[in-house]
């Protein structure tokens, strides 16, 4: 990124509508690399740094020269991008051609480029002289979308902007797909890795390090937001390597069925049933391992105090919770905790069923759904929970608007938000005070993404109060090992450990190599010092003006401070004065610390900030802003 751009904003104010300095500095780099040099770029910015805003700023700049295609993982994230586009346009002080920007979910993009599951090669010519932006790029490979991107890259010879906060999802091999999309180099990955017996024993050898540096040099933008303006994180549980884990010792009932299921697994690290019984056991249903039966059984007894009928669980066991050491800990602990909770779990069908009926049986009511038994209250209202899965029919955006609203800062509208993997990417949560992992994530990048979505800058009123993190592991009734090093166990001994502990150790092994590669990517990230690129000068100037008038409500028209600020980019005095006149005559929008939302006006020999607000008469129900006078009202 362009360090000179960051230097322009040493005392940047972030609590107003703005473009952050690192976003402008990265935009400068993208314009130089992708538009000027036609190179592909990996935007490796850690979660919470505003990759979406950077991508959309770049799309608007690039739209003046080329068509821009943006691919996002699903329809819900598509809505987020469309909303964010409106936000970015309001801050964008330059020309753009919105008709040249196309945003698709991967499924809809697939549908317009395939006929009967075969790529329509004749239609790919539409992507000539285009730019592709791919959100969460690490997730598009291994499916038809990844295949299509590779074909477009080879056929159309166009650049890609790949967005990822975690380009290695599982092992270093996953990075190979990103490299292949960014470069024309042919790589034999057998030559650059060391492969052990286990999946986590995949290491980049010395030759691989050199290949990585040579191919990606000049194609990486790395950034991690400073940890300032964030609450502290309080990890709970027993010390476990460099983190903490809550050991949830199983009851004899759970342990018995857990062991029986484990004996049935051929490769337990890849079988959902081990995740299931680590969360909770459901008797014979776990042995059958067929989730469809969950919704077919009629009054089937699972345990003496637990039955299932047409997908509904009922019985005293949902309160005593011998079926789940994790939920026994969770239900007991939440009684004493304040604020909102975010709870991650996997296997949405199995997990969603268990969560719903345990919560209802323990007095927590379903948001817009069933009321809990003897409902627990907050401010006279039921304490509610919501379960988010990829299958949910209701609008996820509406649910998150309620969860993130100021009125819900204390959790009085939705206190508990349970979610499967869908929430690990692209969504933002606010005022989360308690984060729970009911299932061990498949990768530590997923674990970090969930933390990143939940603990965000500018999302907390009070950063002096810590955020609690609970990583729960189901362990045997007599297990209490303290694990301080990855060398504490041999591979054979690891296989005898509780499944959750074994999975955590595997993830830590893989994370060690992932962090080594991330360090390499960080070191080859491009950094330089130059004046802002001509294509982004107006955008940079707009942010300079916004920052200046946050502090100043009224100045002389020839104020030297404003002139100096503008001349930091426009070195010519006459050009700077002309620019100032244009923004005042055009009533530039700013946010002032006294008047809030304001427009610039000339009054006698002064430039003043004039507050405004949009209002309407009660009978007005629609306004078409494309016509000067077109107010639709009732008779």
Swiss-Prot record:
GO terms for cellular component: virion component. Keywords: Activator, ATP-binding, DNA-binding, Helicase, Hydrolase, Nucleotide-binding, Transcription, Transcription regulation, Virion. It is found in: Virion. It is an enzyme of class 3 (hydrolase). Disulfide bonds: none annotated. A motif (DEXH box) lies at residues 135-138. Heterodimer of a 70 kDa and a 82 kDa subunit. Part of the early transcription complex composed of ETF, RAP94, and the DNA-directed RNA polymerase. This is Early transcription factor 70 kDa subunit. It comes from Myxoma virus (strain Lausanne) (MYXV).
